[in-house]
Amino acid sequence: MTSPKHIDEFIRPRHNELPNELWTETLPNLWQGGTLDVWGNEDWFEQANIIGKEITKKDFDCVYTFYASAEPADWFVKELRFGFYDSALTDFDPVENLLDIVKMAHKDWKSGKKVLIRCQAGLNRSGIVMALVLIRDGYEPADAIKLMRDKRSSWVLCNKNFERYLLNLTDEQLAIWRN
């Protein structure tokens, strides 16, 4: 497992690599993604071949949505919604607000359900929650971030506040997410 010596060495410059698909499989049955209204960019939708794509039971068993204005999943798809801002964590406590959600998403995924964790662009809010699910599964924070960037986009967790939160977790904080 990777463990950066200095956090600033890990926070690298971003590239012009937006995701080329609405949803990306990070690990078997565990997906990260966005919504159809990402930036209102129809050109991106055409490139990604996702115009008119809705979430149905054929796609996912469970959807965890972290963008309050997202279109809901279709009938018979279990969906949990908790909107929060893609910004600083000054008025938001991840443990208080996300721990139960992360436990539920992890439990659904480990029970064999196909799980989507999504926000608007599929980069930051979904990124912090996906990283916490991976941490719960035993990943180190840096390894979880690298996996998401390798699978989805180098822009995952371009919100440095979210990235720093994950990379600065103490052993005691990691234990909270893992138990």
Segments (PLM) and residue ranges:
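Short, basic/low-complexity N-terminal boundary segments at the transition from targeting/disordered tails
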Residues: 1-10
